[in-house]
């Protein structure tokens, strides 16, 4: 089997160093690899909040090392974990003003994440109350709409995802990505994925591998091929 060209590829979900756990690349190393293969864009992500400032510095690095015409741009976003105050419209707005391209719901602070990791889900960030999203999340949705960026569902449960997506659509959000629905923490059924696409016109993110814990990873490629056929 020959090599697959990565020219023009866009990757919207890459974790890099610095982080609280070791990643394969730091921001500059990832940019080096991206330029080498002719990638168009990468969105870097951290569970620790902001990556917009890191993306800016990386783009400056790329210009200095490779010149102005690489065709590659690195972007950042905001993850609404407890480290930035959870569902924090002010923090999100600052990130958007700095150029954030994706705003993620909670990851490690999500109730679903804590439950799947054997921790107390009650300590997670509340997104839905009495069947509706919390008011501050509506404010975040309006910002996402106004800046025309992407909402990522991150590590929320399938049940939360339906409520959140409907509210986001009602608020005028146009670009919604269901973050790695096949990951065992999210664990969204095929039927739910089909429903979300059919009813709300969302994008299903497909990751090539999933973290199984303890440093172990599982290839998603065979399962994702079947999921793509089904959806």
What do these predicted regions represent?
Residues 83-90, 221:
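Glycine-rich anion/phosphate-binding loops
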Residues 103, 136, 143, 163-164, ...:
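Active-site-adjacent C-terminal substructures of enzyme catalytic domains
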